[in-house]
């Protein structure tokens, strides 16, 4: 990294920081909390063993809907008409392409489109339950900042209910791959821990240069000049790559280049893992079911539009700075893992 490289890196960081501060204000409010929780979870659970064997069972469309309907009944019967609607009005799509499209929900001209990449096992059930949670929370609504932040909490909650139902009905882990929730959580944490220091250093101390290594060592961990340079170089190359891919997509599709959209794509290396960590942790946490249903119904409505993340955590009776919170997280992850081990 030469002087010009650091100037370029800081320009990227400045754009990302300004974007996040304006559009994702809760990120910085709880950044340190999520980092400390992430460190604790990673140190406590990174050595968990997961069996990678996976089987297919040619689960039919009818089988998938049957199981998802039972899962939704377990959460709240009032959502069954919504489930039937997505089937009858063409909002549910199963992708059979060899090239994966991904599992996702999106609002499209008043419709709430759910796409599921077929795995041909009970992951199809779990994935549909997850995306259906997004559907209920978002269809026909303008997503608020709070709704964006907590969206994965709702999806993960529905996913965990699906896993619990399938395990209780005697299905084995090689059909469920329910361990993916913990594996993805640990992956998100690994990336978050890796990316967190640069944005938090820029947030507190401003421009990054080689001298910033001393502050890095003071607040994070010891690192020599070569490794610090390499860390910064990796981020610079990643931002360059994201920019290059975005410009290529715009060129190939005759899209107008939108600078704010480009910065949003770059910002996701900090915000996406944050959202998935927070969402998974809350979904695993022992919460009052009625409070969760209220969030599903109202997260993106006027009822919650003036609430902050602090208000939501208070409503859920959560103090993320407390030892009780950490203990409950440990217990929740351990209990989830034990339930998986029973069906391996």
Which residues are covered by each model-predicted region?
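Contiguous, non-catalytic segments that form substrate-binding/exosite surfaces or channel walls
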Residues: 1-113, 315, 333-340
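C-terminal, non-catalytic "cap/extension" segments appended to globular domains
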Residues: 2-5, 14-23, 44, 214-344
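Short pre-active-site segment immediately N-terminal to the catalytic Zn-binding motif
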Residues: 109-128
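Active-site-flanking segments in enzyme catalytic domains
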Residues: 125, 135-139, 259-263
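Active-site His/Glu-centered metal-binding helix of metallohydrolases
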Residues: 128, 132-136, 154, 278
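Catalytic Zn2+-binding segment of zinc metalloproteases
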Residues: 133-145, 161
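Post-HExxH zinc-binding segment in Zn-dependent metallohydrolases
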Residues: 145-188, 279
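Active-site-proximal binding-pocket segments
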Residues: 182-201
């Amino acid at each position: 990294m030469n002087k010009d490289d650091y100037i370029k890196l800081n320009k990227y960081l400045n754009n990302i920081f300004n974007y996040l501060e304006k559009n994702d204000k809760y990120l910085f409010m709880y950044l340190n909390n999520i980092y400390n929780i992430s460190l604790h979870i990673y140190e406590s659970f990174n050595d968990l063993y997961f069996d990678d064997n996976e089987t297919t069972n040619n689960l039919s469309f009818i089988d998938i809907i049957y199981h998802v309907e039972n899962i939704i009944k377990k959460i709240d019967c009032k959502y069954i008409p919504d489930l039937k609607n997505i089937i009858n009005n063409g909002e549910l799509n199963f992708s059979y392409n060899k090239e994966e499209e991904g599992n996702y929900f999106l609002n499209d001209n008043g419709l709430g489109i759910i796409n599921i990449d077929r795995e041909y096992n009970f992951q199809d059930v779990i994935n549909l339950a997850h995306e259906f949670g997004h559907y209920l929370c978002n269809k026909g609504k303008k997503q608020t900042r709070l709704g964006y932040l907590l969206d994965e909490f709702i999806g993960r909650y529905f996913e965990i209910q699906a896993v619990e139902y399938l395990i209780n009905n005697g299905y084995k882990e090689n059909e469920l791959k329910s361990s993916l929730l913990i594996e993805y959580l640990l992956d998100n944490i690994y990336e978050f821990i890796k990316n967190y220091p640069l944005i938090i250093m820029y947030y507190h101390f401003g421009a990054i240069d080689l001298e910033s290594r001393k502050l890095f060592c003071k607040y994070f961990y010891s690192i020599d000049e070569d490794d610090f340079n390499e860390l910064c170089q990796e981020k610079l190359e990643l931002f360059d790559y994201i920019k290059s891919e975005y410009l290529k997509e715009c060129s190939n599709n005759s899209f107008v280049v939108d600078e704010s959209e480009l910065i949003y794509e770059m910002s996701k290396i900090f915000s996406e893992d944050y959202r998935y960590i927070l969402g998974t942790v809350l979904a695993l946490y022992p919460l009052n079911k009625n409070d969760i249903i209220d969030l599903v119904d109202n997260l993106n409505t006027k009822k919650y539009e003036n609430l902050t993340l602090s208000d939501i955590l208070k409503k859920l009776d959560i103090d993320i700075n407390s030892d009780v919170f950490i203990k409950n997280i440990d217990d929740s992850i351990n209990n989830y893992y034990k339930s998986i081990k029973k069906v391996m």
